[in-house]
UniProtKB/Swiss-Prot annotation:
Protein family per UniProt: Belongs to the asfivirus I329L family.
Organism: African swine fever virus (strain Badajoz 1971 Vero-adapted) (Ba71V)
Cytoplasmic-facing ranges: 261-329
PTM text: Highly glycosylated.
Signal peptide coordinates: 1-31
InterPro entries: LRR_dom_sf
GO cellular component: host cell endoplasmic reticulum membrane; host cell Golgi membrane; membrane
Record keywords: Disulfide bond, Glycoprotein, Host endoplasmic reticulum, Host Golgi apparatus, Host membrane, Host-virus interaction, Inhibition of host innate immune response by virus, Inhibition of host TLR pathway by virus, Late protein, Leucine-rich repeat, Membrane, Signal, Transmembrane, Transmembrane helix, Viral immunoevasion
Name under which the protein is recorded: Transmembrane protein I329L
Primary localisation category: host cell
Membrane topology: Single-pass type I membrane protein
GO terms classed as biological process: symbiont-mediated suppression of host innate immune response; symbiont-mediated suppression of host toll-like receptor signaling pathway
């Protein structure tokens, strides 16, 4: 009986040794909108993605699906890649390939990324900065059926998700928080939220409370980083704010000058109207009278307020000149 058992053990080990995981990788060419297959190397139980110089420069994405690879890493299959090939891609799909850490390809994510699918891997840590960029850019992101840890390294992620839950998580599918998998103390629990068996918002509150208790310095760091990012985002608006304030000051000054000019003009006009209708003598303290026996052209005005006579030549008007001329005739 023991010999039969040993025989089947050796037979099973031999068969499993002969089975090699199948890997299919394709890259996307943007010109004709088609996917092309590409051979992927498997070396020492490691999947090697194509090198940068072997992919066309106009490639817009990459798709790599690993078949017959257990995402629990029972086959001890890991994936290695050149991050430089991901910088210009708009579409990244690496499924069932046993990736453990998404932060390794963080440098490869560019602003052009419009689709990210990393399902059925063994992701244990996600950099919240990557997730923040994907959420705010409304990029379709598929991360469920992974294995996020409930330890210190994911505390920034939980802080960010709780802080941005009402604003940004609405843009992602509902299964993002419902079907993503978490692990606690290396006990893998899939297809639902573990770490206390609390779904959604309650789970985030539970995790953030745990992180604040155990690692309070991480909470301060994350808040500072978020505040710093918001400040940097507002700094881009500073020139526009300065220009708007300057324009407002100039317009206010212009209106003030116009108002001042209108007031001054109105005041000067009323003064001219008064002078045109009311005679203001040059010497207001004097009273004048004309002698009747004198001619108007040579009339002498006597001053009755003083003892001295100061003859002032009276200049007749045009009508008086006409009257005097008619009398002479």
């Amino acid at each position: 009986m023991l010999r039969v058992f040993i025989f089947f053990v050796f037979l099973g080990s031999g068969l499993t040794g002969r089975i090699k995981p199948q890997v299919t990788c394709k890259y996307f060419i943007s010109e004709n909108n088609t996917w092309y297959k590409y051979n992927v190397t498997i070396l020492n139980s490691s999947i090697i993605l194509p090198a940068y110089n072997t992919i066309p420069s106009n490639a817009a994405g990459i798709s790599c699906t690993c078949h017959d690879i257990d995402y629990l890493q029972k086959n001890n299959i890991s994936i290695h890649y050149n991050t430089s090939i991901l910088k210009t891609f708009q579409d990244i799909r690496i499924i069932r390939c046993g990736m453990k850490n998404i932060s390794e390809i963080a440098g490869g994510f560019g602003k052009e990324l419009k689709f990210l699918d990393l399902r059925y891997n063994d992701l244990q840590v996600i950099d919240y900065n990557i997730l923040r960029k994907l959420i705010r850019s409304n990029t379709p992101t598929y991360l469920y059926y992974n294995n996020l840890m409930c330890g210190k390294r994911n505390c920034p992620l939980y802080y960010f998700l709780l802080k941005q839950e009402q604003t940004y998580l609405k843009r992602l599918p509902q299964f993002f928080l419902r079907r993503i998998s978490f692990s606690n103390n290396n006990t893998y629990l899939y297809h639902f939220l573990s770490c206390g068996n609390k779904p959604g918002h309650e789970f985030l509150e539970y995790q953030t409370k745990y992180c604040r208790t155990k690692f309070p310095e991480i909470n301060i760091t994350v808040n500072q980083l978020i505040a710093k990012k918001n400040t940097e985002r507002y700094k881009s608006c500073y020139p526009l704010v300065f220009i708007s304030i300057l324009c407002s000051c100039i317009s206010f000054l212009f209106l003030f000058i116009c108002l001042l000019r209108s007031i001054c003009k109105k005041y000067s006009c009323t003064k001219q109207d008064k002078s045109s209708h009311n005679y203001i003598p040059l010497i207001p303290s004097y009273t004048f009278s004309l002698k009747k026996h004198r001619h108007p052209e040579t009339a002498v005005v006597e001053d009755h307020t003083t003892s001295a006579n100061s003859p002032i030549v009276y200049i007749p008007t045009t009508e008086e000149k006409k009257v005097s001329c008619s009398r002479r005739k």
